[in-house]
Amino acid sequence: MAESRQTRLQVKCPTCQTAVVWKPENAFRPFCSQRCKLIDLGGWADEEYTVTAQEEGLLEISEPDGAYR
């Protein structure tokens, strides 16, 4: 009964754009299926996707005073 009062959140599968109800029972969310999930994983493995980051200051590591050498 609580579910009927709440609006079901629907999202589009990132791979095939099929509408998917966002709920804990969907083990593949936000994907619609294991197949779409694996297609996306393959895209990351093939470096089809990237995550941009600020490179400024990322590699600046200072050694503490008296560090062993």
Curated annotation (Swiss-Prot):
InterPro entries: DNA_gyrase_inhibitor_YacG (IPR005584), Znf_NHR/GATA (IPR013088). Keywords: Metal-binding, Zinc. Binds 1 zinc ion. GO terms for molecular function: DNA topoisomerase type II (double strand cut, ATP-hydrolyzing) inhibitor activity; zinc ion binding. Zn(2+) binds at C13, C16, C32, C36. Signal peptide: none annotated. Its cofactor is Zn(2+). GO terms for biological process: regulation of DNA-templated transcription. Belongs to the DNA gyrase inhibitor YacG family. NCBIfam families: PRK00418.1. Interacts with GyrB. Inhibits all the catalytic activities of DNA gyrase by preventing its interaction with DNA. Acts by binding directly to the C-terminal domain of GyrB, which probably disrupts DNA binding by the gyrase. HAMAP family: DNA_gyrase_inhibitor_YacG. This is DNA gyrase inhibitor YacG. It comes from Neisseria meningitidis serogroup C (strain 053442). The gene is yacG.
